[in-house]
Amino acid sequence: MGTNRELELYMKPTCPYCIKVMSFMDENGVTVPLRNIEADEDAAKTLVTVGGKRQVPCLFIDGQPLYESDDIIAWLRANTL
């Protein structure tokens, strides 16, 4: 099952919660564009501007932020598998 929604995962490669989400995605064949806020200053600014905080992981779903790794995994499981 796929989704017609626009998705982006804002993350840092060293963040254990980001790694948890990305591992779930890898194990389940879920592909979501990644935005590394450490390497991409525009991504970091967007995260704060739209989401109101610099917290990762953050899954943007049609431009709306969803935080917390367990919540992100639950959403991905329900909407992309």
What residue ranges belong to the model's regions?
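Short alpha-helical
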Residues: P16-Y17, D42, Y67
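C-terminal basic regulatory modules in eukaryotic proteins
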Residues: I61-D62, W75-L81
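Polytopic alpha-helical membrane proteins, predominantly small-molecule transporters/carriers
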Residues: S69-I72
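A short, hydrophobic beta-strand/beta-hairpin element that forms part of a small beta-sheet core
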Residues: P57-P65
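Short secondary-structure transition/capping segments
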Residues: G2-T3, K45-V48
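Local sequence-structure signature of Cys/Sec-based thiol-disulfide redox active-site neighborhoods
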Residues: M1-V30
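Thiol/disulfide oxidoreductase modules built on the thioredoxin-like
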Residues: V48-Q55
